[in-house]
């Protein structure tokens, strides 16, 4: 536990933090990088089985989908919003000098969407995005594979490392997903979800267990066919 022993020390801390808060992009990068470093030192798993994806893996997946300033990007199991942050960093690295004011406005908010069932993770992800210049993202408490999520053909990019922990309640699963793969396994349901949420021509990069590629059950075969 870290204690602030005197009012004088507290004043110095506040003054130091105020000096960090500037609109300069490089300083915002520093704050975001520091926040991500601190996240890496926290417990690795959330209450629902989420694990933080290592940054080099996230960056590789973002490179594969090559997001553009006009994309709509979603992570339906966002955790700490690592994939969304990596996407933002990719866009700044490749398009910062050529983006229009309208594209910067899109970048600051509606471009990025994340869902999660862990309220603590949602608070962490919102702060993570704000520290990377994304001031108004759509971060919602939502069970992505349930009936409460009816989003269809909305996004151009999906990135995710969905939970592989067990199964979900069959009665809560969205009927559209069960029509694609009749299962309670989360890894298969999320793949069906990506197919539904993406626009025609959309791109997706997702981490899955080996069983998704080689499983012989009817559910595995049906999702691979789609």
What are these regions (language model features)?
Residues 198-204:
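Short glycine-dipeptide loop
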Residues 50-160, 165-169, 176, 184, ...:
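Conserved S-adenosyl-L-methionine
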Residues 15-18, 35-43, 62, 66, ...:
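Amphipathic, well-packed alpha-helical segments that form the structural scaffold of globular domains
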Residues 189-193:
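Short, conserved SAM-binding segment of the class I
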Residues 213-214:
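Conserved BB-loop
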Residues 1-42, 50:
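Long recognition/docking surfaces used for binding and targeting
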């Amino acid at each position: 536990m870290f204690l602030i022993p005197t009012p004088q020390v507290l004043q110095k801390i506040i003054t130091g933090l105020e000096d960090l808060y500037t609109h300069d992009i490089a300083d915002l990068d520093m704050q975001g990088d520091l926040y991500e470093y601190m996240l890496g030192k926290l417990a690795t798993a959330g209450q629902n089985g989420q694990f933080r994806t290592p940054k080099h893996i996230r960056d590789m997946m973002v490179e594969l989908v090559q997001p553009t300033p006009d994309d709509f990007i979603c992570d339906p199991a966002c955790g700490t919003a690592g994939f969304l942050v990596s996407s933002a960093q990719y866009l700044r690295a490749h398009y910062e000098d050529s983006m229009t004011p309208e594209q910067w406005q899109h970048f600051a908010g509606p471009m990025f969407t994340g869902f999660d069932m862990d309220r603590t993770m949602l608070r962490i992800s919102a702060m993570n995005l704000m520290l990377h210049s994304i001031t108004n993202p759509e971060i919602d408490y939502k069970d992505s594979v349930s009936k409460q999520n009816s989003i269809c053909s909305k996004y151009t990019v999906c990135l995710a490392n969905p939970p592989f922990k067990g199964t979900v309640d069959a009665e809560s699963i969205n009927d559209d997903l069960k029509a694609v793969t009749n299962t309670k396994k989360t890894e298969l349901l999320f793949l069906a979800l990506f197919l539904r949420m993406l626009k025609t021509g959309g791109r997706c990069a997702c981490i899955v267990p080996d069983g998704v590629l080689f499983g012989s059950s009817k559910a595995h075969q049906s999702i691979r066919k789609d």
